[in-house]
From Swiss-Prot:
Keyword RNA-binding: no
Protein name according to UniProt: ATP synthase subunit b
CDD domains xrefs: ATP-synt_Fo_b
Primary location: membrane
A Pfam family of this chain: ATP-synt_B
GO molecular function ontology, one term from the record: proton-transporting ATP synthase activity, rotational mechanism
Species this protein is from: Priestia megaterium (strain ATCC 12872 / QMB1551)
UniProt keywords, alphabetically: ATP synthesis, Cell membrane, CF(0), Hydrogen ion transport, Ion transport, Membrane, Transmembrane, Transmembrane helix, Transport
GO CC term, one of those recorded: plasma membrane
Spans traversing the lipid bilayer: 13-33
Coiled coil: none
Function per UniProt: F(1)F(0) ATP synthase produces ATP from ADP in the presence of a proton or sodium gradient. F-type ATPases consist of two structural domains, F(1) containing the extramembraneous catalytic core and F(0) containing the membrane proton channel, linked together by a central stalk and a peripheral stalk. During catalysis, ATP synthesis in the catalytic domain of F(1) is coupled via a rotary mechanism of the central stalk subunits to proton translocation.
Gene that encodes it: atpF
């Protein structure tokens, strides 16, 4: 059968030696391509694959770092909000304390002024009473001297008392 195939191939105008030569040349070409073309191309592809894998790893690493930074920023923001809340609470408490201090100082000043006013009123009252006593004493002396100057009847005594009351009323 192999011989009949050769005749069929020969009748068709195909030469078996040419096919064998082309097959050997193709294998040599394939070996040369493997050594000089496919090897370097595969090396370049391998390097490219490693480079891309490295880039992916680097991107994932940077993504993780970015997530960490975002989380850190959130934590810092949370702490800042807490600090602001504490500061606001302290400021409110400080303002409340200051208000109470000012109110207490105002009350003390009011009490002091009230006490000073009472003391001044008391002094003026004492001075008025003392002045009135002096006037009463001098009027008493005056009346006594008038009584001594003349002896009075009951009518004269009543008249003298009414005059004295009028003088005391006028002095006031």
């Amino acid at each position: 059968m192999a011989v009949s195939n050769m005749f069929v191939l020969g009748a068709a105008g195909i030469n078996g030696g040419d096919i064998l030569f082309q097959l050997v040349m193709f294998l040599i070409l394939l070996a040369l391509l493997q050594k000089f073309a496919f090897g370097p191309v595969m090396g370049i592809m391998k390097k490219r694959e490693e480079h891309i894998a490295g880039e992916i790893d680097e991107a994932e690493k940077q993504n993780e770092e970015a997530k960490k930074l975002v989380e850190e920023q959130r934590e810092i923001l949370k702490q800042s909000r807490q600090e602001v809340q504490v500061m606001m609470e302290n400021a409110r408490k400080s303002a409340e304390d200051k208000k109470e201090e000012i109110v207490a100082a105002a009350r003390e000043e009011s009490e002091r002024l009230k006490a000073a006013a009472k003391q001044e009123i008391e002094q003026q009252k004492d001075q008025a009473v003392a002045a009135l006593r002096e006037q009463v004493a001098s009027l008493s002396v005056l009346i006594a001297s008038k009584v001594i100057e003349k002896e009075l009847s009951e009518q004269d005594q009543e008249k003298l008392i009414h005059e004295y009351i009028q003088e005391v009323g006028d002095v006031r």
